[in-house]
Amino acid sequence: MTALAEPETIAEPLPAVADPSGSTMIVFESVKKVYEPNVTALTGVSFTIDKGEFVFVVGASGSGKSTVIRLLLKEIEPTEGRIIVGGRDLGRLKGSKVPLLRRNLGCVFQDFKLLPNRTAAENIGYALRVQGESNAQIRKKVPEVLNLVGLAHKMNSRPEELSGGEQQRVSIARAFVNHPPLLICDEPTGNLDPDTSVGIMQLLYRINRTGTTILMVTHDREMVDKMRKRVIALEAGRLVRDERRGGYTEE
C-alpha cells in the first residue's frame, strides 16, 4: 500500500492537558451520563485508549455504546466525569472550538450518509470544501483516497450506481481523506452482507496500520471474534469487560 501522509493538525490550538508520553488518544474518567427525565445511560465508565489502537465497543442495545460516541463528538455533555480526546479536555472546550475538534476526527456510520446527487469524488470533495481546503488540494487528495479504498474507477459514479459496500468505501474515504488521528465507526458493517463486511474490515485494518486510532461500535460477533482486537464491553451503562485481545463475549 502506498505510504500515507502524517495526520494534519487542527488549524487553531485547542485546550490541552498534560500527557508526558504523548501516547494517549482517548480518556474516559468516571464518566456518568443521565438523560432527562432521569434515564442513566452511563455510570462510572473509565478507560484509556492509546494512539494507534483498534478497539471494539460491544454490548446489547441500550448498553451505552451510542452515548460513548455522542460524548466523543461533544454532541452531549457528561453529567459527571472527564473526557479527553487527543490531549484536549472536552469539558474545557468552548462551543466555538467544537467544529475544530470534529474536523480532526473521522466518522463512519451504518447508513453511509452520502449526498445522493453527487458522485463519489464530489461527496469527498464537498467534505473537504466545507473544511476550507483549496481546489488544488481537493484535486490532489480525492483521487489519492479513492485509490486507497479501491474505487478510483468509480469516482464519477453516484451513490445509486454503487453497491452497499462501495458506498461504505466512499464514506470511509470521506472520513479518512484528511488522515485524522482518530476514526470513529458506528456499526460500519451493519447494512452489509458478510463477504462485503470482510472487505470493509480489511480496509479499516489497513487504515489502522498507518497509525490511525480506530474506535468501532459493532454488533458483529463473528467479526470481533475473528479479529481478536481490544474489546470494551458495556452492559446497562457500565463497563463490564476490557480485554486486550478479546472476543465478542467473555471466554
Task: Please describe what each predicted stretch is.
Residues 177-181:
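A short, proline-enriched helix->beta-strand linker immediately N-terminal to the Walker B motif
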